[in-house]
């Protein structure tokens, strides 16, 4: 099956080094970017636990991280278009 990703989604994915081809299922691309986000959030939590960042800055850093992954807030059905 061939998928036609929206340009806005491709742009966001490419910011994270993800360039899905026409045969890449949206579920696979979504899972990959979600795994990257989870890796970063876990690393941030570990920095908090080890004292590398103060607790008072943790929430703002989590918010900044979420802002770097807006594509995850889009439903997967929106990632592709049907022409």
Q: Could you tell me what each predicted segment is?
A:
Residues 55-64:
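Short, charged, amphipathic alpha-helical segments
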Residues 67-79:
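Amphipathic alpha-helical coiled-coil segments
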Residues 23, 48-55:
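Charged, low-complexity interaction regions
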Residues 37-45, 65:
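Non-transmembrane amphipathic alpha-helical segments
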Residues 44-45, 59, 77:
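N-terminal secretory/membrane-targeting helices
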Residues 1-33, 76-83:
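Long, non-catalytic architectural segments outside compact domain cores
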């Amino acid at each position: 099956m061939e998928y036609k990703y929206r340009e806005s989604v491709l742009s966001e994915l490419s910011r994270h080094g993800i360039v899905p081809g026409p045969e890449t299922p949206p579920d696979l691309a979504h899972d990959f970017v979600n795994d990257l986000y989870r890796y970063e959030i876990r690393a941030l939590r570990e920095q908090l636990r080890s004292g590398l960042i103060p607790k008072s800055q943790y929430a703002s850093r989590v918010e900044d991280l979420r802002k770097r992954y807006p594509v995850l807030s889009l439903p997967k059905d929106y990632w592709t278009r049907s022409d």
